[in-house]
Amino acid sequence: MNQKPTAIFLMGPTASGKTDLAIQLRQELPVEVISVDSALIYKGMDIGTAKPSKEELALAPHRLIDIIDPAESYSAANFRSDALREMADITEQGRIPLLVGGTMLYYKALLEGLSPLPQADEKVRSKIEEKAQKFGWATLHKELSLIDPVSAARINPNDSQRINRALEVFYISGKSMTELTEQKGEQLPYHILQFAIAPEDRAILHRRIEMRFHKMIESGFKQEVERLYHRGDLHIDLPSIRCVGYRQMWEHLRGDYDLDEAVFRGICATRQLAKRQITWLRGWKYPIQWLDSLKNSENKEIIKRAFDLTMQNG
């Protein structure tokens, strides 16, 4: 018997049909939707993130969307805390949390808990940035390779934010990020049914991504990014502006290349994101059932059967 309450994970790459399936499930099962998407958290970033429409949200309200301003920071630790709170609230109502999205790091944080990484320290970060201005980030990347070769191998020498964080962790704790991330936190107190949805043919996903990006442009994506660009308090190194599509449109607005090139690069970046998400899922160490994006009614029945079986055994 399952002593833990049940929750459902509906994972998958971008443009795989997660939202549509979640809305259908919300109509037929006692579930409430929690978004697991590091882009949907931002207010005012609706078109480029493919945020569910008002009509879709009326059918299936999503928790943890539109929760912070694009200038604010939000970590996997923030997500875990927020998601656990929402899951507990849903469970107390006698309903089932349905977690939907493609940010695999968030799912991992939920399932395994978080490593005891130190909180950010602005003084330490400022010192690292001063050092970078003097010697360059490539030099700091070499320093990181001596301290933490595993992290250094994973981090691009131009990725200033991640280099800064890895060095900051070492300077504060005296331990490398690799050492600390091997220590796991508290595990998720739920029995999880895990599903991943994607087209069997990768070419179909690529076509979906391209079609969706062009639809975003028609819906005013450039104008959405222009509003962010002209706010004056945002910049390209923020996680919000580094979201796929936004970064490329931002670079277009500052004159790096024309709109056609921005669209092309945005589509390529979205395809690369989807590839990374699928790679995460292929290497997922937990039991997972794959669903074909082209078989939505069949997918719905598979999840309903698994849900019913779990409820009977619980």
UniProtKB/Swiss-Prot annotation:
It is an enzyme of class 2 (transferase). GO terms for molecular function: ATP binding; tRNA dimethylallyltransferase activity. It catalyses: adenosine(37) in tRNA + dimethylallyl diphosphate = N(6)-dimethylallyladenosine(37) in tRNA + diphosphate. Its cofactor is Mg(2+). Its EC number is 2.5.1.75. InterPro entries: Dimethylallyltransferase (IPR039657), IPT (IPR018022), P-loop_NTPase (IPR027417). It holds the Pfam family IPPT. Keywords: ATP-binding, Magnesium, Nucleotide-binding, Transferase, tRNA processing. The keyword Cytoplasm does not apply. Belongs to the IPP transferase family. Catalyzes the transfer of a dimethylallyl group onto the adenine at position 37 in tRNAs that read codons beginning with uridine, leading to the formation of N6-(dimethylallyl)adenosine (i(6)A). This is tRNA dimethylallyltransferase. The lineage of its organism: Bacteria, Pseudomonadati, Pseudomonadota, Gammaproteobacteria, Pasteurellales.
